[in-house]
Amino acid sequence: AARRGGRKKIAGLCCAVDKKRFHAVLGGPFGQGNKDCLEYVLSVAEQLGFRTVNLDGYCGYAEIGEGKELVGIVGHLDVVPEGDGWKYPPYSGALEEGAIWGRGTIDDKGPAIISLYAIKALMDDGFKFNKRVRVIFGCNEETGSLCMKHYLEVEEPISYGVSPDSEFPVIFAEKTINSVEIKGESTDGKGAKLVSLDGGIVINAVPDICTLTVNANGENPADVAQKICDALSKNNIEHEYAVHGDEIRFTVHGKAAHGSVPQLGVNAISYAVAALDGVVNNDFVRIYNAYISTCVHGEKLGCFAEDEYGKIAVNVGLCHYENGKFSIKINSRLPFSTDTKTMFNGIKSTLKNEVCAKVVLLSESEGFKIDPDSDMIQVLYNAYREVTGDVESKPVCTPGGTYAREFNNCVAFGPEMKGYGEMIIHQPNERLTLEAMKAIFEIYVKAYADLIDKVSFDSKK
C-alpha cells in the first residue's frame, strides 16, 4: 500500500503550498501555505498509523516505534519562490511527461513524503522498530531554519539521523555558509544616471531577472539604450527595454541556479551592472564592477579560498539601488581552509578605501565534517550501492546546507542522483520523474532499515 500511495501524496503536497507562505498567521509563523502544508502532511501520517505532533506551526513530526534512541529523518516543506517560466503551474503537482511538476518536488517536499512512505513500507513489512523513528517536517529551512531552533527548544534532540535534502550516495561534510551585505550611498558623476535597480528573490539562489531604470540626463536616450544593449548582447544576455522620455527601463534575464553552485547559473544582477560600465558613472556601479563583477569565487573581493573540496562559492543573491542608496547581499559557501572571520576581514580590507561602502555580516551557519569511514556513513553508502549497483560514486562534501547541521550525528542523504536526468532545484520546471521517485523510495526503504538496525549513538545531545 505504501508503495502504491506515494505518487498521489507527493502531487498533493505540491498543491498544498501556495504563494502566501511568507505571511505569518495564527498557528503558522511561516505563513498560511506552510501551515496548510504541515497540517496536511501530519494528517496523512496519522492516517498511515503514525503518532503525530504539531509544534506550534514551526514544524511537526510523525513517529513510530519504542526505545531510548531516537532516529530522525528531517525534511522540509517550505520552498523558495517559484519565479517565472514554468511549463506547468508551479503549485499544481501536475503529473505530465512521466514526472510530477512543482516547486518542492525535489527540494524538499517530495523526499520528505517519500521518506514517510519508506517508513510506512517497513511498518507494513513487519519491521521491528526497536528505536523510535521520527520523520520531522520543518517549515523554514530555506530562510533560516528557525523551525529547527524551535524544535530543539521544546523537544528532545534526535540521537542520530539523516536529512533527505541533498544528493546520493551520502554527504559526509557540509561547508560553512554565511551572508554578507555591502551597503552604502553612491555619488553620481556626469552623464546618464541610474535611477533604480532590483534583482533577486532570495539570497541563496542565482537571480535570473534584474530590472533597472536609467535616466539619460541630457544624453540621447536611444544612444544610452544602445550602449547598454551592446554590452548585454556581447555577453549573450537576453534583455528587453522600453524608452519613456528620458528614462530607459531594462529587464535583464539570467539563468537561475542554487546559490551554492553559482557557476551553474547566469547572474542577472552581475551582468546588468556590468552593462552599465562606461554608461553610468557612480560609486555603486564602479564598486560592483571593480570588486564583484561576474566572478563567483571572490577573486576580486579579497576572499578567494580553496581546498581539496573545491573553491569558495560567492553568490550575489539580492541587490537594490534607489535614490543613491545601494544594498548588495552576498551568500557564500566556504572551503574548510578558511572561515567566516577570515573571509569577512578580507572583504573589509579590500574595500577599506571605499568610504561610501560598509560591510555587514548578516548570518553564519557553521559547517561540519564527519569521518567518511564512520559506521553511519558506511551503512548509508552501502545501502545506496546495494540498491543502485553504483560502485563508482563516493561520499560527498557539499556546499549546500541542510538540517543535518542543526543536529549532532546527522548527515544529508539523497535525493539527487545520477542516471535520472537533470534534477532541477531553485529553477523553473522543478520536477520529479516517477522513475526517480521509485528509485529514491527503494534506496530509502533499505537505508532506513539499516540505519535503525545497524547504527547506534549515545542519545545525549
What are these regions (language model features)?
Residues 70-137, 143, 155, 427-439:
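Active-site metal-coordination/substrate-binding segment of hydrolases
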Residues 340-356:
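Redox- and metal-dependent alpha/beta enzyme cores, enriched for Fe-S-associated oxidoreductases
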Residues 41, 112-122, 151, 272-276, ...:
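Buried hydrophobic packing segments
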Residues 2, 322, 375-454:
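Zn-dependent metallopeptidase/amidohydrolase metal-coordination segment
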Residues 1-103, 127-129:
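Acidic/His- and Gly-rich active-site-bordering loop/insert found
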Residues 142, 148-335:
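Midchain, well-structured core segments that form catalytic/ion-binding scaffolds
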Residues 59, 292-296, 315-320, 329-336, ...:
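A short beta-alpha structural unit
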